[in-house]
């Protein structure tokens, strides 16, 4: 469970365990941005009137890699600069950490990831999976917070004013711990997360905006780390989710890993060298695998060339391999197959057949893979729609929901569902459901339980999420104790357990003895999540990096201006070649080269002294002005001389 503040009402024998107490007010002031916090890439959007707009980042891209790196100088890089230096700094470059969010270290998925990433995944004191870089540990929510902050800064740069409110998306199949950890990520960087929206639902919002006809739409969302399938009924601005299903550990990262393993295996067969423990080599192969995967969506074959990947006594070794689309599809067939069952379950839960589906939307970068498109067509019996951009639809939908919450958009109603059944443990370790999966939220449900033994004065309420019949096979999301029950025969006390799920899909559970108004005590034991103190510490840490981040931002802006000056000066030199002093022109060319080298380092994510950059820019500006002033003077003198000569010749003729 998440560490939470628990309020005890002493006027009645009741106790309440809020798995998520840190709910934010939905009172909105200012702009509400929509953020798609993705496993591989993230995006941010805003509504401009009735039109949603994706905002480009400082590097000019519409999506930002969800990558955070820590340099040896202590600088934190986020996005493109972080991804660029991953090969030379693999142990301290954190990517795909969304897969760890809200997870326990012992989870099977986490144990698999430990073997597949170059950075360290460690066990936190509360049993959660955390990551380590440069000797410092971070929660996955904290890393997500750094990416959210980058999105926040991107929006602020575009809007020209501070942004406080956001709608953030999560995979539809995220459980309570993962949803709350996502809200924590926003809180860490000072974002008021007004709503957590399911990714496929957000994509449907992007698709259905301004559409008045009635449709049943399936959203097939295969992203970088997660897979979701949602069935929605869209009717004149009302978006009702009928069912959802998925796999929170299936996505593009897995396709990369399959190809990476194949490359490492082939290389070992060819050379006898095992690259498994060479982190720098593995990172190079990982990046090449990702690039090859993307290329194979539009071409039938690709080549992977990695010179000097390693060396032995006989000399340097290189990777030079060809992969056809057919080979890649055969290799990753088990991954594509894993999308089939969730689709069938979602249709069954919605009480629909494939013929009832009007359109199928493809969302997420992996949905571009031809084999995935073919599988979707086979499942639904129709070609999927290309009405939305797979990379941008989720962020756009989040912005639409933000505009709904701020009152800018009034003709949209979103009715989402809880993805997993919720219940408590009863006698014998049985999972007793109170709220079945795919129940429309917000919702509230109560049920009466009693004691399992005579004279029992307290009961432990253990809260689980899942679909199995025994609690041991489901996810424990919280537990608390209701104490002070008067001794009575077994089965006599009446204990009312209430589940209350808000619009974010976050859960409040309470227990009350209906027979007495005596005082009680409460004991809460957390299963996972960040405590308030930990969040506060992370907020402080984020502030520490603020000045560094600002310096980095200024360096990028200065570099962009310097690059513009260098290009303009270079073009002018070409235009007036032969008219300016050769020695002076060469001096300016040397300054241009020097400045461009510095700019390239900044754009490559390196730490560069801002003063040095500023000085070199000013020096080039001064030199170029002097040079072109001289050119202007020379031109003026030549014109004067010509005029004088013309005047003299005129007098002679007279």
Swiss-Prot record:
Keywords: ATP-binding, Chaperone, Hydrolase, Mitochondrion, Nucleotide-binding, Phosphoprotein, Stress response, Transit peptide. One of its GO terms (cellular component) is mitochondrial nucleoid. Gene3D superfamilies: 1.20.1270.10, 3.30.420.40, Actin, Chain A, domain 4, Substrate Binding Domain Of DNAk, Chain A, domain 1. CDD domains: ASKHA_NBD_HSP70_Ssc1_3 (cd11734). It is an enzyme of class 3 (hydrolase). Its EC number is 3.6.4.10. GO terms for molecular function: ATP binding; ATP hydrolysis activity; ATP-dependent protein folding chaperone; enzyme regulator activity; heat shock protein binding; mitochondrial protein-transporting ATPase activity; protein folding chaperone; unfolded protein binding. This is Import motor subunit, mitochondrial. It comes from Saccharomyces cerevisiae (strain ATCC 204508 / S288c) (Baker's yeast). The lineage of its organism: Eukaryota, Fungi, Dikarya, Ascomycota, Saccharomycotina.
């Amino acid at each position: 469970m998440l560490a939470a503040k628990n309020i005890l009402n002493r006027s009645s024998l009741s106790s309440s365990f809020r798995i998520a107490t840190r709910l934010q007010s939905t009172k909105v002031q200012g702009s509400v941005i929509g953020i798609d916090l993705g496993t591989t890439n993230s995006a941010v959007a805003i509504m401009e009137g009735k039109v949603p707009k994706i905002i480009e980042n400082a590097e000019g891209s519409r999506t930002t890699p969800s990558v955070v790196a820590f340099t040896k100088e202590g600088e934190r890089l986020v996005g493109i600069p972080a991804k660029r230096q991953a090969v030379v700094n693999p142990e301290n470059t954190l990517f795909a950490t969304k897969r760890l969010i809200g997870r326990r270290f012992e989870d099977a998925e986490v144990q698999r990831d430990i073997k597949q990433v170059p950075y360290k995944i460690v066990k936190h004191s509360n049993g959660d999976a955390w990551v380590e870089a440069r000797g410092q540990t971070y929660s996955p929510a904290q890393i997500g917070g750094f990416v959210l902050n980058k999105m926040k800064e991107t929006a602020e740069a575009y809007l020209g004013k501070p942004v406080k409110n956001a709608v953030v998306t999560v995979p539809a199949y995220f459980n309570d711990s993962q949803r709350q950890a996502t809200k924590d990520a926003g809180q860490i960087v000072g974002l008021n997360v007004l709503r957590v929206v399911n990714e496929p639902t957000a994509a449907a919002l992007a698709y259905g905006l301004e559409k008045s006809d009635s449709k049943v739409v399936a959203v097939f969302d295969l992203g970088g780390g997660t897979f979701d399938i949602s069935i929605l009924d869209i009717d004149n601005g009302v978006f009702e989710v009928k069912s959802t299903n998925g796999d929170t550990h299936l996505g593009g990262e897995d396709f990369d890993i399959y190809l990476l393993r194949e490359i490492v295996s082939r290389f070992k067969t060819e050379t006898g060298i095992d690259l498994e423990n060479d982190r720098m080599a593995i990172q190079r192969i990982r990046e090449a695998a990702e690039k090859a995967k993307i290329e194979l969506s539009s071409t039938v074959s690709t080549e992977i060339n990695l010179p000097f990947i390693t060396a032995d006594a006989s000399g340097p070794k290189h990777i030079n391999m060809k992969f056809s689309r057919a080979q890649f599809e055969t290799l990753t067939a088990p991954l594509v197959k894993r999308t089939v069952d969730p689709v069938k379950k979602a249709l069954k839960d919605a009480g629909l057949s494939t013929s009832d589906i009007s359109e199928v939307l493809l969302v997420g970068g992996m949905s571009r893979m031809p084999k995935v498109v073919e599988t979707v067509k086979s499942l639904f019996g129709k070609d999927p729609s290309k009405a939305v951009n797979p990379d941008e639809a989720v962020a756009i939908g989040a912005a639409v929901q933000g505009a709904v919450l701020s009152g800018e958009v009034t003709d949209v109603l979103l009715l989402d569902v809880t993805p997993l059944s919720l219940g408590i443990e009863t006698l014998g370790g049985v999972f007793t459901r109170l709220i079945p999966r795919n129940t429309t939220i917000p919702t509230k449900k109560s049920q009466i339980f009693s004691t399992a033994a005579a004279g029992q004065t307290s009961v432990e309420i253990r809260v689980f999420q899942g679909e199995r019949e025994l609690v041991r096979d489901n996810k424990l999301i919280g537990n608390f104790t209701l104490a002070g029950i008067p001794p009575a025969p077994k089965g006599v006390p009446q204990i009312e357990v209430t589940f209350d799920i808000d619009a974010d899909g976050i859960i409040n559970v309470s227990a009350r003895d209906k027979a007495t108004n005596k005082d009680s005590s409460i004991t809460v034991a957390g299963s996972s999540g960040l405590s308030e103190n930990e969040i506060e510490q992370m907020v402080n840490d984020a502030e520490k990096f603020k000045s560094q981040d600002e310096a980095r931002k200024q360096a990028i802006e200065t570099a962009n201006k310097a690059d513009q000056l260098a290009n303009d000066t270079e073009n002018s030199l070409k235009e007036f070649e032969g008219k300016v002093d050769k020695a002076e022109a060469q001096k300016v060319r040397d300054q241009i080269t020097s400045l461009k080298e510095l700019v390239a380092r900044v754009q490559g994510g390196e730490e560069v002294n801002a003063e040095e950059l500023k000085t070199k820019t000013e020096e080039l500006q001064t030199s170029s002005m002097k040079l072109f002033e001289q050119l202007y003077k020379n031109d003026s003198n030549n014109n004067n001389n010509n005029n004088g000569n013309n005047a003299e010749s005129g007098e002679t003729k007279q």
